[in-house]
């Protein structure tokens, strides 16, 4: 088995999908989890206005609405959380995403004050954060807020991770990578677009340039610029296609380098890091 085949198998990626079937699969998956643990009453997700959170948010709201109808439990709710750092440049996209999702509840937590307070506390301890590390601080503060909300609403935090993100480890460890349940796992980027199109999402929300937008020195830095490969490259790789060797090597390099992000904390019994 080649490394490409191993990666595809590990991430559950498929070359072709039926969007309607995958929508149903994700919704039923979320419903089944909540039914298994009836003390859970909410799904919580941060909404950024990008493709991934828009899709995960819509699937979460669909799952909650169906489960509420089936069980008669009106305590069930989907909570969409806006988590700007100060003023968000693409705020209108966030509002458009919320209008499309139609969540039961919308909360806004501006993380800037918390991030600056943490940065100042570290500075007083003699640690000056780089712009890159400050970006990770933002991602972790956002997740901290979501877990606080979930803790107070008997909820679970929904993640937006998918195969095209997992393969490169393009997420912050214990930030946006630290979630409870990931309904998009297995899908690549273009497949996520197919699901949103099938759901009637406004095109500009899934055709916009993907960006984590965490760094102050490089605002709205495109994911593809940071990775050195395009999402089309990554999707082709996950679909089993043959790529230029340099591109394939870059993708595989990211996968190996970020293996620790896809695992629980390393123990004495782990040996993947010795490769």
Curated annotation (Swiss-Prot):
GO BP of this protein: NAD biosynthetic process
Organism: Salmonella paratyphi B (strain ATCC BAA-1250 / SPB7)
Catalyzed chemical reaction(s): deamido-NAD(+) + NH4(+) + ATP = AMP + diphosphate + NAD(+) + H(+)
GO CC field: cytoplasm
Short name of any one Pfam family annotated for the protein: NAD_synthase
Binding site for deamido-NAD(+): 140, 173, 180, 260-261
Family: Belongs to the NAD synthetase family.
Subunit structure: Homodimer.
Enzyme class, UniProt record, top EC level: ligase
A single MF term (Gene Ontology): ATP binding
Gene name in the database record: nadE
Pathway the protein acts in: Cofactor biosynthesis; NAD(+) biosynthesis; NAD(+) from deamido-NAD(+) (ammonia route): step 1/1
Keyword set, alphabetical order: ATP-binding, Ligase, Magnesium, Metal-binding, NAD, Nucleotide-binding
Biological role: Catalyzes the ATP-dependent amidation of deamido-NAD to form NAD. Uses ammonia as a nitrogen source.
Annotated binding of Mg(2+), by residue: 52, 165
Name of protein: NH(3)-dependent NAD(+) synthetase
Residues binding ATP: 46-53, 160, 189, 211
EC numbers, comma separated: 6.3.1.5
